Amino acid sequence: SSAASDVYKRQGYGRTAITDGDKSITEITCHARGAHFLNPEVRTVIDIGGQDSKVIRLDENGAVANFVMNDKCAAGTGRFLEMMARTMEMDLDQMSEAGLTYKEDITISSMCTVFAESEVVSLIAQNKETDDIVHGLNKAVASKTAALAKRVGGEERYMMTGGVSKNKGLVKTLEEKLGTTLVISDKAQLCGALGAALFAMDMVQK
């Protein structure tokens, strides 16, 4: 194509549904490219979206050195948090703020959405504070994510992308688990799309 606007990149879960794209690239590769563009010092990308969570380790050039995904169930994803918010009759903005000032360090023992929901209902019946329950949920997701980071050999600096990066309580809890501060761009939700656009620009310039 002769113009950048004429190049179409496909990435993510819907990439196979688009038949007229110029090239198909995995979202792992696109997230790595986008993250490196936003901050070249980043060596580990934590992406928690609606359908999956993934941790990607980058080399100094922004190429994928290693990665691990959780895409088998909703556990540890944005969908998990959405369902827990619905159970607690709160929206995601409220959930983001809740848990920041918890008093009781509650532990949610199951990451299975069905069993975790039962635990939350039981905690509500016990008149546990909302902030404490939300912190327990944040801690469960953060622990699972930190375990993924350990598996992939995560190293600083860490960047968090995806819609869940807007959840203040979860970000704080994850930072505590990792022992470091997460880099979060105001374009965190667009990181994969940004990477795809950069690959498209490369095609145009060749």
Question: Which positions does each model-derived feature cover?
Answer:
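Short, small-residue-biased leader/transition segments that mark boundaries at the very start
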Residues: 1-7
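Conserved phosphate-binding/catalytic loops in two-lobed NTP-binding clefts
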Residues: 27, 175-194
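Glycine-rich phosphate-binding/hydrolytic loop that grips phosphoryl groups
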Residues: 78-82, 185-206
